[in-house]
């Protein structure tokens, strides 16, 4: 048992490298070994332990960067670094362990491999909503490096793509058990499935060239270090950096700043004066991330993470409040039990908003606004977006430096564009900022920690809603049925050939 434990930990660590920015796809084969070990376990407790150890390694290498965010204010939160580095993998590993336990109980089933894949995706889905949810680094994102491979998201969503990836990745497991007839069936089924999604993706990209609206946007990326983001001494420097990057003689319709670009209320007279000076200079509307409150005091006071639009005459065209808040970052869960303050600036917890669409009548533009990690929740993005024209995602990933985190966040976010057939304008404080078309193609972008701006036209959305945007995760049944049918027919053909 000792050697399997060590190998599970090492292979789990390796498997976490299948995501951005490394996309080490050969590491997906580690899942075949896990699938084999679960089937050969002597009891469910052993399967649980092996799955847990693999899962711990998987999440440790995949989301290690969260501890970097905690270390930004190391003098206040030094004690939280080990909890961020090890605590989250310790918790998330239970989901891998649970999928292995359930799979163990069907280890003798003819379709054990197929059921193993189902349980893996089922517990990815559970992970996406339980305890507020964290659907980060779902295994389907291993394919997000390729425009072609992610096109099926418009039908089956990320959980459907996860099923494809886990199925292909574990199809080598009969090699370890010397079940070579089954190995032939699984490899052939995987090859057919991969060929189908490659063909579908290629044809879809060819048949849908990018079309553009006439709305021109300017994405501003100041790359302000997180240690200076909320500094009173740096406030005016940071504001003027935003303004200087936004000013240009080229005509523009919308200037877009990142999450918390304004760290004070916009209507402070001296701040508002600078903003209106900019907007009149460029003759444009500003969309920015900022903070907002309900103008009440005492126990009724509420603070929001916001996105709002300002006209050059000072009118606020819309205000959106973030509804998926980051636990421990923007609010403290179990506050009565845990006597700690949140990791972000200030002592007051942020309050949840209501979500939904916002409108810019002047441009006849309906926007699905997303702040920060709201973009990682497929169902949240899909909800109430039937009439949306564009997704605008503002975020601040400066917490995580040059780690894997900002790259993973970018690829996760652009997957929402493909799922919903909507273009995305993504503006990040330190990158990666980009204009993305409804098929996930990156039209223009600013790299991590680049200080610059880009101008571009907003791409048009697709002519009709995607299957996923209409029906949601129920569409995963399509790919499950397809793969099962191919598997069954090939298996039956193999049996008949023996007879």
From Swiss-Prot:
This protein's record includes keyword Lipid metabolism: no
Keywords of this entry: Acyltransferase, Cell inner membrane, Cell membrane, Membrane, Transferase, Transmembrane, Transmembrane helix
Domain of life according to the entry: Bacteria
Compartment(s) of residence: Cell inner membrane
Keyword Transmembrane helix listed: yes
Membrane-protein topology: Multi-pass membrane protein
EC number: 2.3.1.269
An individual GO BP term: lipoprotein biosynthetic process
GO cellular component, one term: plasma membrane
Pathway given in the UniProt record: Protein modification; lipoprotein biosynthesis (N-acyl transfer)
Family membership noted in the UniProt record: Belongs to the CN hydrolase family. Apolipoprotein N-acyltransferase subfamily.
Protein function: Catalyzes the phospholipid dependent N-acylation of the N-terminal cysteine of apolipoprotein, the last step in lipoprotein maturation.
UniProt name for this protein: Apolipoprotein N-acyltransferase
Organism: Rickettsia bellii (strain RML369-C)
Lineage: Bacteria, Pseudomonadati, Pseudomonadota, Alphaproteobacteria, Rickettsiales
């Amino acid at each position: 048992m000792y050697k399997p434990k060590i190998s599970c930990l090492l292979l789990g660590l390796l498997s976490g490298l299948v995501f951005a920015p490394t996309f080490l796809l050969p590491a997906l084969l580690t899942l075949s070994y896990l699938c084999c070990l679960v089937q050969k376990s002597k009891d469910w407790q052993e399967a649980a332990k092996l799955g847990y150890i693999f899962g711990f390694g998987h999440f440790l290498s995949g989301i290690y960067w969260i501890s970097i965010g905690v270390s930004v204010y190391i003098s206040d939160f030094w004690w939280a670094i080990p909890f961020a580095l090890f605590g989250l993998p310790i918790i998330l590993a239970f989901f891998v362990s649970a999928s292995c336990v359930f799979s163990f109980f069907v280890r003798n089933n003819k379709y054990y491999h197929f059921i193993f894949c189902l349980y893996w995706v089922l517990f990815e889905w559970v992970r996406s909503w339980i305890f507020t949810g964290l659907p980060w680094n779902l295994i389907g994102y291993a394919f997000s490096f390729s425009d072609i491979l992610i096109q099926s998201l418009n039908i089956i969503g990320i959980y459907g793509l996860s099923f494809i990836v886990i199925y292909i990745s574990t199809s080598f497991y009969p090699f370890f058990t010397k079940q070579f007839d089954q190995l032939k069936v699984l490899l052939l089924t995987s090859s057919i499935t991969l060929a189908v999604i490659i063909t579908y993706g290629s044809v879809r990209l060819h048949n849908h060239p990018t079309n553009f609206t006439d709305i021109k946007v300017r994405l501003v990326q100041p790359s302000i270090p997180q240690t200076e983001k909320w500094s009173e001494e740096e406030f005016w420097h940071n504001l003027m950096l935003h303004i200087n990057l936004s000013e240009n003689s080229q005509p523009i319709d919308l200037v877009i700043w990142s999450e918390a670009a304004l760290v004070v209320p916009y209507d402070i007279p001296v701040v508002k004066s600078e903003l209106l000076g900019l907007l009149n200079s460029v003759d444009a509307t500003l969309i920015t991330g900022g903070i907002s409150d309900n103008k009440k005091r005492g126990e009724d006071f509420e603070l929001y993470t916001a996105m709002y639009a300002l006209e050059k005459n000072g009118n606020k065209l819309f205000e959106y409040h973030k509804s998926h808040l980051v636990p421990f970052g923007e609010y403290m869960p179990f506050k009565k039990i845990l006597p700690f303050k949140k990791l972000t600036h200030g002592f007051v917890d942020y309050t949840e908003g209501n979500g939904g669409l916002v409108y810019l009548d002047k441009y006849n533009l309906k926007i699905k606004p997303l702040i920060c990690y709201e973009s990682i929740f497929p169902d949240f993005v899909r909800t109430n977006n039937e009439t949306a024209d564009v997704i605008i995602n503002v975020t601040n990933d400066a917490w995580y430096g040059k780690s894997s985190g900002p790259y993973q966040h970018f690829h996760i976010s652009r997957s929402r564009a493909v799922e919903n057939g909507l273009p995305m304008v993504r503006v990040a404080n330190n990158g990666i900022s980009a204009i993305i078309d409804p098929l996930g193609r990156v039209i223009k972008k600013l790299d991590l920690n680049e200080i610059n701006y880009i101008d571009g036209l907003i791409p048009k959305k697709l002519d009709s809603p995607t299957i996923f945007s209409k029906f949601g995760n129920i569409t995963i049944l399509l790919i499950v049925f397809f793969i099962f049918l191919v598997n069954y027919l090939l298996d039956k053909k193999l049996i008949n050939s023996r007879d």
